[in-house]
Amino acid sequence: SIVPFGRIAIPILPDSSVNEVTNILEHSESKVIFVSQKLASKVSKECRDRMTLVIDIDTFEVLQSDDEKFTCDGRTSIPTPDDIATIIYTSGTTGSAKGVVLSHRNLASNVITCYHSCKRTEKDRWLSVLPMAHTLEMTLCMLYPMYCGATVYYLPKPPVASLLMKALKMVKPTTMLTVPLIIEKVYKGSVLPTIQKSRTLTWMNKNMNGLMCRIIGMKLKATFGGHMSFYGIGGAKLDPEVESFLLKAKFPYAIGYGLTETSPLLGYSMHNWRTVGSFGYPVYNVKLKLHNVNPETGEGEIIAKGPNVMLGYYKDPARTKSVFTEDGWFRTSDIAVQDEKGRYFIKGRNNNMILGPSGENIYPEEIENVINNLEGVSESIVVEREGKLVAHVQPNENFVQW
């Protein structure tokens, strides 16, 4: 509600620590804060004292003001397309928080991109399960449905299994956008045990396009309310085994690729041109190409250009300069290859790459995908230690017996 009137929105994740909240409020020089009573304790007294206004986001009651007679005088400032709309703080993969500055043009162009890539209508029902502080959720699950006139249902708290199942049954959504973790948990918790109990396990592994696979896929669709026509997955790489099942079960999924810095969508894969492990092609109005390509492996860094690319990092011109090429392309730090059809396959993050003893490039993400697919593993991280690769594994609590 504030952005159309020239104000700047700075969302903060609800699970942020007191220090993280303090750092964001101080770095952004915020003057007004909307906060629930439940999370008010995360705003330090020092921060509250610097605020012009503190408002209860649930009741819109003024909790604190530097003027007891404070009133809204209705003054507005109509923004231009290149004015700042929002600053999204993200730690990314390098640790230190970055304030990603996105303009009205950045967000609006990505909404139009979504419409050209996947048309939704006022008849669609969206179920929102991700934090609104993510650009994926803000652009694709709030602004885009508004543009389409669709209805969005929001969960009151993080989507634990029981809450999500109840919401799916009630809403019967036609559209959802999630991170891979949600569909991977459903696959490991419901689909995989069904496959493993089947006497046709060996046959199915070799022929996952068989009748049994289709039947399980229909049951999976029913789990999501029975009306799903578009299930978007983004934010991280999807487990290849899970994607292979979704593809052969004819589940209506699509893979999206992007970053906070690009508002976020850059590429997508859906319908008949989906293939396991690829995010497909650039979306409408966006250009992608590989930079500094290794002639032996074909690997290069994905760089992007389009109206959705951020203005820069807030108060950090040096970091901003470092992520753009001399001719203005944004450097994603994602290393990828392209196949003969031009589809992109991400290998890993440039900053995460480990140089092997024979000079080969090792991407921890590829090893982690294999480990995470093992029975009893919840998640893992692979690092280099004294010249050797070491995997830290978190067991699945439902599987491991202590």
Stretch-by-stretch model annotation:
Residues 40-81, 190-219:
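ANL superfamily adenylate-forming
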Residues 70-89, 96, 119-125:
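Conserved pre-ATP/AMP-binding loop-to-beta segment of ANL
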Residues 85-111:
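Conserved AMP-binding A3 loop
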